[in-house]
């Protein structure tokens, strides 16, 4: 079925499934609020210094349920490093006025953060110090919870120590007054020593599954950043939203309601390659790949002379190519983004979706990808899950 026209059938099928179940069991249909999904947004503090600048004043709070304010940094001894410019009192004030919960996100990509988490989680004393410092920060500035982004456990005991750390955080931030979440990879067992997802589930309100970065500078060919489905043409069979969702619900046994599925507001540009699955020069993509935002860098190229937009019909992923100089860009557009919402929320009934990151589709005037997500939530007829 073409990826440009399948969303409404999912909405009808979802309602029909609920209706049949109700008739068979004699129960009434659930109201929207009981099954309404979340829409979460990672908001990086440094977005204000990007071009175009994106601050808390640009955030359309009515189009999301939660904000994850990224990132403050952990230290090996359990302290917190607060970047200069991180604090935005208006963010908390305006979000709360709109009924949006804000969690502080700690960590992020980078070996330094992973090493800090590894060391601070290794002993009861440093775990306690970390939890104490996080608790003080949340209380002082009025956050509604904490999100941990540990990418990824690498030391032999990290998997066990990560579980102990999350248990301590959950004890300090009880539900429903506070929310505790984790950003987790699409394939946890392929990331360092792995994460004990089944046991971690008892200590988090939800997981944010990072279903993007299926391709990048580490690849040897130009692949797809965040495909909905696994393409049979992918030489490495690196995965997709669907394979990650099946892994978490099937292998790990996690409830769909506890899972938020990610989408990317950025793409990857491969220089020296002009076809999907084309090999990078000299057998490595390390020096030919650039991360570029949708709003400021990718959107202006769509329809521009010399560029061709195509859709991988096997995966649902759009991409741009140029012949001279040879260039390939993997990204998501409004249609592929809406299609993900229709599949994740409408067809599969997962707990929510999120994006990395909220500023990525801002073009100085609007946010096409966020609008596509929000519009699809409205098409599905759901409000946001109770905050």
Annotated model-derived regions:
Residues 37, 63-65, 98-102, 142-144, ...:
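Short, well-ordered coil/turn segments that N-cap beta-strands
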Residues 3-17:
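Bacterial N-terminal signal peptides that target proteins for export
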Residues 34-138, 284-286, 367-383:
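Glycan-recognition patch characteristic of GH18 chitinases/ENGases
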Residues 76-86, 152-297:
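Substrate-binding surface in catalytic domains of secreted glycosidases
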Residues 16-27:
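Bacterial N-terminal signal peptides
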Residues 63-64, 224-226, 258-343, 370-387:
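Glycan-binding loop/region signatures in secreted carbohydrate-active enzymes
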Residues 67, 104, 148, 169, ...:
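Conserved, mostly hydrophobic/aromatic
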């Amino acid at each position: 079925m073409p990826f440009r026209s399948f969303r409404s059938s999912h909405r009808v099928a979802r309602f029909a499934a609920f209706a049949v179940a109700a008739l068979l069991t004699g129960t009434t249909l659930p109201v929207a609020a009981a099954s309404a999904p979340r829409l979460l947004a990672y908001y990086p503090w440094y977005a204000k210094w990007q071009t175009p600048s994106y601050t808390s004043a640009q955030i359309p709070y009515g189009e999301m349920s939660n904000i994850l304010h990224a990132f403050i940094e952990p230290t090996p001894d359990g302290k917190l490093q607060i970047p200069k410019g991180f604090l935005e009192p208006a963010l908390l004030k305006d979000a709360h006025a709109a009924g949006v919960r804000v969690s502080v996100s700690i960590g992020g990509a980078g070996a330094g953060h992973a090493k800090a988490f590894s060391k601070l989680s290794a002993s009861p004393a440093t775990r306690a110090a970390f939890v104490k410092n996080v608790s003080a920060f949340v209380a002082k500035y009025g956050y509604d919870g904490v999100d941990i982004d540990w990418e990824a456990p690498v030391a032999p005991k990290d998997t066990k120590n990560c579980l102990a750390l999350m248990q301590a955080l959950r004890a300090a931030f009880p539900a429903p007054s506070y929310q505790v979440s984790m950003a987790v990879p699409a394939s946890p067992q392929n990331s360092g020593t792995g994460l004990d997802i089944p046991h971690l589930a008892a200590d988090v309100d939800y997981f944010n599954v990072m279903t993007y970065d299926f391709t990048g500078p580490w690849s040897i060919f130009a692949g797809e950043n965040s495909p909905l489905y696994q393409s049979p043409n992918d030489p490495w069979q690196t995965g997709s939203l669907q394979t990650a969702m099946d892994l978490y619900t099937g292998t790990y046994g996690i409830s769909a309601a506890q899972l938020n599925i990610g989408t990317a507001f950025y793409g990857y540009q491969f220089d020296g390659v002009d076809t999907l699955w084309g090999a990078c020069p000299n057998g490595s993509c390390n020096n030919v790949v650039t991360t570029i935002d949708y709003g400021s860098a990718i959107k202006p190229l769509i329809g521009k002379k010399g560029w061709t937009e195509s859709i991988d019909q096997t995966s649902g992923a759009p991409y741009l190519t140029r012949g001279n100089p040879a260039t390939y860009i993997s990204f998501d557009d409004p249609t592929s983004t809406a299609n993900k919402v229709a599949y994740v929320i409408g067809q599969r009934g997962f707990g929510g979706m999120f994006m990395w990151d909220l500023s990525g589709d801002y073009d100085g005037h609007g946010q096409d990808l966020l609008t596509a997500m929000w519009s699809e939530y409205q098409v599905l007829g759901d409000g946001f899950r109770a905050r």
